[in-house]
Regions:
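Short, hydrophobic, well-ordered secondary-structure elements
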Residues: 1-16
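Long, charged low-complexity segments
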Residues: 21-148
Length: 148
């Protein structure tokens, strides 16, 4: 599940940046620091908190009515603290360490809820900005006709 969060954050960053380019007139080279999108996102690394911060900053830059959900950060921070290197959950435990015991049912439920929230944030941002842009475009001919 940790890897899924990393991937949805990276995907979300790309989507939010593309929204900025497509609908907000942002410069592609500036947004992606003169890199191709995949090269840019690969260089973001595996740190969940850094990815979350970049995701949230991109979301907030769109100036949407809905605030970024606060409940996501503590869950991602817990995952980050448990697996800073992004390898612990992938490879289990090392032979020389003691195993960790968790309430996996509760953990899975909480992770699933926050994962869904992240996906909803992406959908909300895309839908809202696209709708705002479409409305502006529809109003442009009306404004131009009125000024003629």
């Amino acid at each position: 599940m940790r890897h899924a969060f990393e991937l949805v954050l990276k995907d979300g960053i790309l989507i939010l940046k593309n929204i900025q380019i497509e609908y907000c007139g942002s410069d592609r080279n500036e947004i992606y620091e003169n890199k191709e999108p995949l090269e840019y996102i690969e260089q973001r690394g595996h740190n969940l908190m850094k990815l979350l911060n970049e995701f949230r900053n991109n979301y907030n830059s769109l100036e949407l009515e809905e605030d970024f959900p606060k409940a996501i950060e503590p869950v991602l921070n817990n995952l980050h603290q448990a697996d800073r290197s992004s390898t612990e959950f992938r490879y289990g435990m090392r032979a020389d360490t003691d195993p960790s015991y968790i309430d996996s049912a509760s953990l899975c439920k909480e992770l699933s809820e926050q994962f869904d929230k992240l996906e909803n944030v992406i959908d909300y941002a895309y839908g809202t900005v696209k709708s705002r842009y479409s409305t502006q475009r529809q109003n442009e001919p009306t404004a131009q006709a009125a000024s003629s």
